[in-house]
């Protein structure tokens, strides 16, 4: 086996799409007046896409344990394999934790929010101090997420163009 399964490949790229939408919606939100319809659309898009990221990452975690990883040919040094393993752990933790922190942030704000058009009421007692702490963690960790994404993509490109192994090709969809 020299590639990940079709399911793993699909989930990888759809996760990237939803991560990009989540980040873009939050960044673009600031371009619009607070409370405007576009601002609110960007905010709701951020919430909804973030929850989809959690669902996708959780699904990927389950599926990852059903399949073995395809071999990298030629094999990289052991330290690179350890670094890759650590990077994947950090990516999974990040994109499983960020949506949960976002949900907690909304809950502690005391405001209702919408998920796919369904109203979600706060389920904890509002607390501005806890909200501020969670917001700080959420935003800091999201900024770290930018670095993790760049490092992950950079490593894949390094393996493809410099080391000339099949690291990147293992996760690419097949050409028809």
From Swiss-Prot:
Q: Gene name?
A: yodB
Quote the record's binding site residues for heme b 1.
Answer: 12, 152
Note on cofactor? Binds 2 heme b (iron-protoporphyrin IX) groups per molecule.
Mapped to this chain, the residue ranges on the Cytoplasmic side of the membrane are 1-7, 64-85, 163-176
**Binding-site residues, heme b 2:** 46, 138
* Protein family (similarity comment): Belongs to the cytochrome b561 family.
- One of the GO BP terms on file: respiratory electron transport chain
**This protein's name:** Cytochrome b561 homolog 1
Could you tell me the keywords of this UniProt record? Cell inner membrane, Cell membrane, Electron transport, Heme, Iron, Membrane, Metal-binding, Transmembrane, Transmembrane helix, Transport
Paired cysteines (S-S): none
Which stretches of this protein does UniProt put in the Periplasmic compartment? 29-45, 107-141
TM stretches of this protein: 8-28, 46-63, 86-106, 142-162
The principal location of this protein is membrane
CC annotations in GO: plasma membrane
Asked if the Swiss-Prot or TrEMBL record annotates the protein with the keyword Lyase, the reply is: no
The family database entries (SUPFAM superfamilies) matched by this protein are listed as: Transmembrane di-heme cytochromes (SSF81342)
């Amino acid at each position: 086996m020299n590639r990940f399964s079709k399911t793993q490949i699909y989930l990888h790229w759809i996760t990237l799409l939803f991560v990009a939408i989540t980040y873009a919606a939050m960044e673009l939100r600031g371009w619009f007046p607070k409370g405007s319809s576009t601002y609110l659309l960007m905010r709701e898009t951020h919430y909804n896409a973030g929850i989809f990221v959690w669902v996708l990452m959780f699904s990927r975690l389950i599926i990852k344990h059903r399949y073995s990883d395809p071999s990298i040919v030629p094999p990289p040094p052991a330290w690179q394999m350890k670094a890759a393993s650590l990077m994947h752990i950090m990516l999974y933790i990040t994109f499983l934790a960020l949506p949960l922190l976002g949900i907690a942030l909304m809950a502690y704000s005391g405001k209702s929010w919408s998920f796919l058009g369904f109203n979600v009421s706060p389920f904890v007692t509002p607390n501005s101090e806890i909200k501020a702490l969670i917001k700080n963690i959420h935003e800091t960790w999201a900024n770290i997420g930018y670095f993790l994404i760049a490092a992950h993509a950079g490593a894949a490109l390094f393996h493809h163009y410099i080391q000339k192994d099949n690291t990147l090709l293992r996760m690419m969809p097949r050409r028809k």
